[in-house]
């Protein structure tokens, strides 16, 4: 691609720098750059097919972000010990990049395009997701691919009341706002993040702060593109791929019919779809009779554009929506808990034609999710999985496991709920939430938030506050600035509209949000209006949820694992575990419990999980017996563990053995101890002495027996 290396630098506060370099790596790609901040380096490449597939009427764009384990000096886990398919974390970053760049390709560009972003060097303090969007955009800018960028994405966090761009990993842990913001020099395109119940004005301030950093990064990309000066590929002009005469005929013939149908306010989406489809079918039949060569591909496209225009005009001119609602009206809500009697927690949440059946399952520390990534190793005690079967929209599709959409929706709902979970010290359980979407007509991820909140309270998890979510939409005339903000959008409004803005939070504030914008001109004032309207909708939904349950249940379900905790001296941990774990494994096997032993702040913390309280209490008793301190002079029932010529070793307390000397077995002289005691025999013994140096125990049996000499006397 290039014969020389070109590099540009972006300056950040606190003497930090980002460099963008091209001309050294992957020169056969249509565009490639290396973005570096500290020791974190990303290689981004773009390639495209110049041959156009005439059957494709969309942009076949593929964005893949992958972390190389070697970047962090690690070898991947698993049997193959190599990178495989993208993990959830990589999918989420791929989606962040895709959502920001996809709107900026020209309408007439429909060539297959692939963007790969590799993490090739990893500084654990500098997070690569903050640089992935910048890398992808820079690679596009220096490539022949027509791209109406540049864009960039930055991470903005509020730490101790101050906003920081691309904070370090350690600093991020103290943030109360954590946002990824993507945009161009003029517009914000994408927002996603989590926060600690903050106010709407705080979100707007964070976005505006991020946009200033984005503008600078876009300017540097322009300088890089000017220095490379790649000749851009020209896609086929729209005039050569469009039939404007057919479009005009379709609009003139059908606009009034479609508008009248839309204004009926049909609430059932299948009936509404059928009504629009009938209009389309009848007119297409008429067109084909007049001209059998009429392009059905073009007609389908123009009819879709007609529907889109009608929806916009209906909302902008009359303040009405497809299902008859007003702009800020929320669909009818129904919810119930304890729907599944055998689950640890469950809820059924229905809003209009969107329905989520959600379960909560409580597990032990052994059920924690293993996280094995290039930059992060550890365990997660909170999981949320979102499932979207095809029948939820009345379609036939093969179930091939969770796709990118399911992973993204589940992650957003998880972020919304995790902010209200009790601290680890207050919650002993690993928590898994599963949301199965049974019906879908818009905002199923926010239905998952609502259902998840209800199910957690049903399960007895002491969340700080209930959480609700709402999806907002926007219809906007970019020429006049006239707009309509929609609350609780339908699936059609999402597809036909200009914005999808999901907001989740408590009565106190916002805990998560996600926004995708398709138009320019979204001013701070308009964003503020959308957030305030979203707040009113969220509070309304919370009110409906409170009719079902207002506080978490005070007890766990009978099917949930029973739990208790115990503190023991640090020096007794080994006694409870036993040689090679023998004692604790035996306890778990015989009581049917799971026992977790940890050292915390110089103490032993033992957690017991069992199928019922009786099992837990049984395990507790056995541990108490092990850690109990023997008392000199007390009598115990001991088991003969071994017999030696000079006596026997007797276990008089769990894990504690003492010597019963041959002279302490009987008052009479014993020649052969095997004739008096048997292995496994249970005998009463008295603790005579604990050696102050060795801690060894001295036992006696004879002192509990009558003394023949005393009897004779």
UniProtKB/Swiss-Prot annotation:
Domain KH: 561-623
Subcellular location: Cytoplasm
Domain S1 motif: 633-702
Bridged cysteine pairs (disulfide): none
UniProt cross-references to InterPro entries, sorted A to Z: ExoRNase_PH_dom1, ExoRNase_PH_dom2, ExoRNase_PH_dom2_sf, KH_dom, KH_dom_type_1, KH_dom_type_1_sf, NA-bd_OB-fold, PNPase
Xref: SUPFAM superfamilies: Eukaryotic type KH-domain (KH-domain type I) (SSF54791), Nucleic acid-binding proteins (SSF50249), Polynucleotide phosphorylase/guanosine pentaphosphate synthase (PNPase/GPSI), domain 3 (SSF46915), Ribonuclease PH domain 2-like (SSF55666), Ribosomal protein S5 domain 2-like (SSF54211)
Nucleus found in the keyword field: no
Binding-site list for Mg(2+): 494, 500
Keywords: Cytoplasm, Magnesium, Metal-binding, Nucleotidyltransferase, RNA-binding, Transferase
UniProt signal peptide: none
EC number, UniProt record: 2.7.7.8
MF (Gene Ontology): 3'-5'-RNA exonuclease activity; magnesium ion binding; polyribonucleotide nucleotidyltransferase activity; RNA binding
Reaction catalysed by this enzyme: RNA(n+1) + phosphate = RNA(n) + a ribonucleoside 5'-diphosphate
Keyword Cell membrane: no
Pfam families: KH_1, PNPase, RNase_PH, RNase_PH_C, S1
Protein's GO biological process: mRNA catabolic process; RNA processing
Cofactor dependency: Mg(2+)
Main location: cytoplasm
GO cellular component, one term: cytosol
NCBIfam families assigned: polynuc_phos, PRK11824.1
Matches recorded under HAMAP family: PNPase (MF_01595)
Similarity comment: Belongs to the polyribonucleotide nucleotidyltransferase family.
Protein role: Involved in mRNA degradation. Catalyzes the phosphorolysis of single-stranded polyribonucleotides processively in the 3'- to 5'-direction.
Protein name stated in the entry: Polyribonucleotide nucleotidyltransferase
Species per Swiss-Prot/TrEMBL record: Amoebophilus asiaticus (strain 5a2)
